[in-house]
Design a protein with these regions (language model features):
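Conserved N-terminal phosphate-binding loop of PLP-dependent enzymes in the Aspartate aminotransferase
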Residues: 1-258
């Protein structure tokens, strides 16, 4: 067992059941064009829909987590008509240009030049050392600053965040995400959780958001979804966001055969 392994080894290295399933699939159907589907993809989608919290029963697969983040950002624009986002400083959502725009690590942003417009950032609610020196677990200073940014910008389409900071394993205050969910609902802002490295049982529950009794509008998963052998990710949303059937939200060559 590798407790790091880039967060892909929930079932260890080369688990026999995963290896055998991949071999069987290669014998049956090694590739599926993106314009079609296949029974294996359908079965996986149904399984994830059954496991997912709330109404997150619609999904689109992608060949990697960064790709799925890009799909979430595009869907948020289609759904709200707004392009602005709020995300956290020091967060990580991938290394592509759109992902580092919403990400907050200087390692990926430094000297790159102009990033995506409308990518607003706020400090994360770190326990005991947050930017606003909040005196207790309520983190009123962090919440009030979020409200301030929402009010001043006025046209935020989505808030995207890691419900649990994974690189440094930052545990958020228990009620923080409930308060964020309320702010999003009051301002018609979509809440997107990036659980690419943390979902699928790594925290004792299938999804991190279940620890906080909060269901996002979109949930992005990946890494361990590919069994530690091949890259795979998925964007899960509720059925109200199934609105772009006539457009290429993903359109990745291997989105149906990853």
């Amino acid at each position: 067992m590798d407790f790091h392994g880039n967060s892909v080894h929930q079932v260890g290295y080369g688990h026999p059941r995963v290896v055998n399933a991949i071999k069987d699939q290669l014998d049956q159907l090694p590739f599926c064009p993106r314009r079609y589907t296949n029974q294996t993809a359908i079965d996986l989608a149904r399984k994830l829909a059954k496991l997912s919290p709330g109404r997150l029963n619609k999904m689109l697969f992608a060949p990697g987590g960064t790709n799925a983040i890009g799909m979430a950002l595009k869907l948020a624009r289609y759904a709200t008509g707004r392009h602005k986002t709020i995300s956290m400083w020091d967060s990580f959502h991938g290394a592509s240009l759109d992902a580092i725009s919403i990400g907050g690590e200087s390692l990926f942003r430094k000297d790159v030049g102009p990033l995506m417009p409308g990518s607003e950032h706020i400090p994360p609610p770190r326990r005991g050392k947050c930017h606003f020196n909040c005196p207790d677990e309520n983190h009123d200073g962090c919440i009030e600053y979020l409200k301030y940014v929402v009010e001043m910008e006025g046209d935020i389409g989505a808030l995207i965040a890691e419900p649990m900071r994974w690189t440094t394993v930052e545990l958020p205050p228990k009620n923080y995400w409930k308060r964020v969910r309320k702010i999003c609902d009051e301002n018609n802002i979509l809440l997107i959780f990036d659980e690419i490295p943390s979902a699928l049982g790594r925290t004792g529950k299938m999804f991190v958001c279940e620890h906080f009794d909060v269901v996002p509008d979109m949930l992005v998963i990946g890494k361990g979804l590919g069994g530690g052998i091949f890259p795979m990710a998925a964007l899960l949303v509720h059925e109200d966001l199934d609105i772009v059937g006539d457009r290429a939200l993903g359109h990745y060559t291997h989105e149906k055969s990853s």
